[in-house]
């Protein structure tokens, strides 16, 4: 069946912003004006079309990227609505990976906000072309000039208005189009009716100056336009629009629009700008992957190429089960076809193909290059996997997600909850690559880890509402370790005589540090002073004792144990006696005074605006942090530091507070390091 919409008339876009900048409302209005919905939902009323998860409607924020398809002026627009809260940046990241363009929504009063900076960096990393919509022009305190100024100051980008607002706050009533040099006055209707007017007299000079600024910027991108401008020729609307498009497609220039989505002012102009300036799949570079021999393979965006797609999201749907969202980069595929999951090397069947609208769906028979769809039936596919035609051998670059930075211990409230909690947690972690589950071997606790307190709060909420699982949460333990600092030779002798056969085991073992090489056992017994059948028992006794620790019950690591001597008894010696003797020898090292507590050290990378460097560094120092590196980029600084894990609990909240939410951080385990004496004494005291 031929495709309904040619590739050049397809747009895959995301809508991104800081929390509360109005991006879900903007998406709602786009869907309303494109005829996709018949009643406008309001985020603050909890009935927004795109925010379909119960937790989203309660909080009025977007958590998962809802995908939907809309139509405007014979173009198909696939839209992903992304979250604005810092704990859900992974949703933004994976959406940007599969999109061709984006609309960045900023608040006319607040300008560029913290999460705008974070999301902007992610979009820049993926080289996503963007247009900017200055929203809430009707808000008290709205200032278009201020909002545009923050684009330069906080993002350091090359942007220019292509519209100007007529009035602001309660007086906001229209816009000036700097390309057409005409005015538009909104009539205040929900379908955004407007009339074309002349530019108000008091704005004519400003509009003329802003148009000249725009043309001068565009002259840098097109020699013909530059010559026409220098020669005093009239720059046509068509020519200017074409050059703005080329500059925007390079992700080197960002057109700025304005309006009020809530008041239905300027939304249709966003739709026009999406078509005019954002790329179709054909404008985007060919997709590059590797085959199994690591040779580069290039796929063009064409229906005639072999089927190639990237899975970017997994969701559990209450009606159809597991839904896998994927972006088709090349080729076509029909419902019921088999595909290869090239990443995992397994064959999968596409049970059903669905075009999604928030949480409702439309079944389709075939998908084409450039499409974003959801599939039912992909059992083994997870986020970042490549899907190809059978026997094809291309793997696309997967997605990298930050490690979780906050964790809590969790336990089921009842026996019934215990049976369900494992399945529920594994389903949730399948959906979200930044949500991790593991068991703490020392404490036996189940630990859940995520990107922030709100992230884990939502997980616990979903456990309760979707999976009907009640759970208690505790504070997690830090996984400390113990080790030796110098060589010591100790003796372990276990003799027990209580009538009948006794017990006898005797060993002499040399213990020494084995830096970063793990625990090691070496047998140096010669001449049969300990029969070889008892050697495994000595090793086993040491392994068990090492895992239980000596100072505070934490596992001993990086210890080399060499069995050098001992003795045995013909009748009384046994495996158990030698196990106990080995354990006694290890415990003797405590008397040598060479055991220490090790603490996990995290490598922490913080990205903060220049204004907050002092706050951030001061706080890190108070957490026993060691600064490793400081690197300035545009208006931000990247600080690298080594900090003990025990000092990092609650850090996300403190960092937000210290930087007004404008900094972000990632951390990962680096090494174990000797804990300072006072810290070690405190740990031992607590454990004993």
Swiss-Prot record:
Predominant subcellular localization, coarse grouping: cytoplasm
Domain annotation tr-type G: ranges: 8-282
Compartments (UniProt record): Cytoplasm
Pfam family, one: EFG_III
GO CC, one annotated term: cytoplasm
Name of the protein described by the UniProt record: Elongation factor G
GO biological process: ribosome disassembly
Source organism: Phytoplasma mali (strain AT)
Function: Catalyzes the GTP-dependent ribosomal translocation step during translation elongation. During this step, the ribosome changes from the pre-translocational (PRE) to the post-translocational (POST) state as the newly formed A-site-bound peptidyl-tRNA and P-site-bound deacylated tRNA move to the P and E sites, respectively. Catalyzes the coordinated movement of the two tRNA molecules, the mRNA and conformational changes in the ribosome.
Binding-site positions, GTP: 17-24, 81-85, 135-138
Family: Belongs to the TRAFAC class translation factor GTPase superfamily. Classic translation factor GTPase family. EF-G/EF-2 subfamily.
CDD domains: EF-G (cd01886), EFG_III (cd16262), EFG_mtEFG1_IV (cd01434), EFG_mtEFG_C (cd03713), EFG_mtEFG_II (cd04088)
Keywords: Cytoplasm, Elongation factor, GTP-binding, Nucleotide-binding, Protein biosynthesis
A molecular function (GO) term: GTPase activity
């Amino acid at each position: 069946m031929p495709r309904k919409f040619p590739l050049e008339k397809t747009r895959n876009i995301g809508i991104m912003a800081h929390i509360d900048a109005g991006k879900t409302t903007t998406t709602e209005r786009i869907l309303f004006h494109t005829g996709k919905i018949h009643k406008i939902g309001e985020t603050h009323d909890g009935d927004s079309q795109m925010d379909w998860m119960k937790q989203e409607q309660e909080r009025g924020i977007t958590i998962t990227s809802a995908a939907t398809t809309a139509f405007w002026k014979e173009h198909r627009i696939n839209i992903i609505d992304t979250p604005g809260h810092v704990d859900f940046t992974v949703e933004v990241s994976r959406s940007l990976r599969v999109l061709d363009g984006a609309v960045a929504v900023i608040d006319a009063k607040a300008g560029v906000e913290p999460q705008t900076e974070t999301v902007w960096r992610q979009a820049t990393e993926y080289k996503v072309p963007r247009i900017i919509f200055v929203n809430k022009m009707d808000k008290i305190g709205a200032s278009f000039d201020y909002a545009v100024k923050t684009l330069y100051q906080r993002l350091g980008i090359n942007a220019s208005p292509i519209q100007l607002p007529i009035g602001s706050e309660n007086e906001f009533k229209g816009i000036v189009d700097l390309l057409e040099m005409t005015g538009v006055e909104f009539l205040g209707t929900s379908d955004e009716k407007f009339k074309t007017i002349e530019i108000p007299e008091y704005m004519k000079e400003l509009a003329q100056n802003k148009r000249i600024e725009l043309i001068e910027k565009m002259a840098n991108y097109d020699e013909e336009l530059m010559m026409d401008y220098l020669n005093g020729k009239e720059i046509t609307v068509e020519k200017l629009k074409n050059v703005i498009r080329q500059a925007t497609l390079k992700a080197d220039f960002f057109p700025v629009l304005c309006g009020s989505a809530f008041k239905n002012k300027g939304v249709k102009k966003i739709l026009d700008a999406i078509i005019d300036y954002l790329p179709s799949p054909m404008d985007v570079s060919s997709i590059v992957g590797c085959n199994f021999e690591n040779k580069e393979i290039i796929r063009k965006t064409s229906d005639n190429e072999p089927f190639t797609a990237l899975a970017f999201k997994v969701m559990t749907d209450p009606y159809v089960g597991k839904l896998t969202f994927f972006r088709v980069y090349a080729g076509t595929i029909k419902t019921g076809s088999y595909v290869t999951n090239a990443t995992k090397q397994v064959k999968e069947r596409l049970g059903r193909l669905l075009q999604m609208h928030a949480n409702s769906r439309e079944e389709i028979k075939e998908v084409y290059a450039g499409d974003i769809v959801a599939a039912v039936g992909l059992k083994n596919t997870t986020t970042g996997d490549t899907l190809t035609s059978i026997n094809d051998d291309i793997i696309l670059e997967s997605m990298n997600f930050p490690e979780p930075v906050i964790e809590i211990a969790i336990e089921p409230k009842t026996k019934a909850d215990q049976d369900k909690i494992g399945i529920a947690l594994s389903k949730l972690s399948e959906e979200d690559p930044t949500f991790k589950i593991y068991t703490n071997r020392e404490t036996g606790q189940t630990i859940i880890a995520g990107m922030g307190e709100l992230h884990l709060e939502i997980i616990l909420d979903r456990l309760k509402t979707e999976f009907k699982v009640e759970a208690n949460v505790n504070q997690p333990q830090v996984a400390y370790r113990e080790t030796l600092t110098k060589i010591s030779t100790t003796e372990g002798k276990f003799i027990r005589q209580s009538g009948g056969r006794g017990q006898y085991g005797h060993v002499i073992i040399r213990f020494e540090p084995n830096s970063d090489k793990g625990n090691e056992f070496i047998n140096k017994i010669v001449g049969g002073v300990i029969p070889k059948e008892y050697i495994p028992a000595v090793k086993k006794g040491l392994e068990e004792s090492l895992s239980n620790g000596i100072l505070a019950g934490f596992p001993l690591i990086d210890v080399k144990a060499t069995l050098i001597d001992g003795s045995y008894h013909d009748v009384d010696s046994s495996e158990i006696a030698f196990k106990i003797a080995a354990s006694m020898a290890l415990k003797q090292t405590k008397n040598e005074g060479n055991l220490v507590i090790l603490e996990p050290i995290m490598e922490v990378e913080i990205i903060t605006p220049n204004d907050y460097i002092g706050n951030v560094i001061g706080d890190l120092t108070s957490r026993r942090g060691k600064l490793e590196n400081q690197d300035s980029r545009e208006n931000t600084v990247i600080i690298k530091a080594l900090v003990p894990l025990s000092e990092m609990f609650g850090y996300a909240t403190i960092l937000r507070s210290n930087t007004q939410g404008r900094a972000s951080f990632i951390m990962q385990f680096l090494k174990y390091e000797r804990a300072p004496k006072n810290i070690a004494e405190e740990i031992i005291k607590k454990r004993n």
